[in-house]
Amino acid sequence: MTFGEKLKIARKKQFLSQEAMAKEMGVSFSTLNRWENGKAEPNYTAQKAFHDFCVKHKIKFDDKE
């Protein structure tokens, strides 16, 4: 499973728009949109922000995904 796919699943589990998720992660809407659509890859800081978001909201992904 790609980062973008995980991002989209986590966002939808929290019933957030891309704009709201971007704000919570501290990035722009266009950046989050590019990640979800596989047009860009996040840097370490962004990956950490996503990890922290998942921990905060108790969202887990199987390592095999």
Predicted features, each with a name:
Residues 1, 11-13, 27:
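Short amphipathic helical patch at the helix-1/turn junction of helix-turn-helix
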